[in-house]
């Protein structure tokens, strides 16, 4: 009886904890009619949640243009705006992917790396991507940034194939899975209108600090250089 109650308690805890990775927020506004429409359209014909995840991931990766790669305006943040304008930095693309997945009742969160902007060292910037809960294996990280020469991010669970890896001493791969985007990310995107203006507002944190949604004190002066 005790074992049964313990299992029930754990199941309830996991269900409650997972709810935050399904929630509607100001940024992840998956209740927007166009996001719901697209989420249903992408899911159509796929019989498993894993197949839906793959389809959503590839759609955002390939159909939403990375703001720097294509030098496109405006700078987007909210999921519905990313969809409307079909462009966004890595952070914004992760917001739309999370929205599409949550609209399909698939838990999705946010992950971050600290990377050199030009692979040569300073300046550094955060890089944003997603973690998705797969029923058969748990959390799996994916990067819908967009592929190009030298970048080949794929959905190949259980193997993780991200766009980048932390290699330099001052780079970092933070393991926390956040239910909401970091506030410093949202603020950086909200204060810029153009893709080149955003280059001078790329958010950064100290690599020894595991960032939290309320983290502001570790914000470093943003680099003014090309995006990773």
Where are these regions (language model features)?
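Active-site nucleophilic cysteine motif
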Residues: 52, 56, 86-96, 101
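Hydrophobic/aromatic-rich core segments of domains that either
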Residues: 92-182
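Alpha-helical and coiled-coil interaction segments, frequently adjacent to or embedded
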Residues: 172-205
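Secondary-structure boundary elements
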Residues: 17-85
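Intrinsic low-complexity, disordered N-terminal segments enriched in polar/charged/small residues
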Residues: 206, 218, 225-226
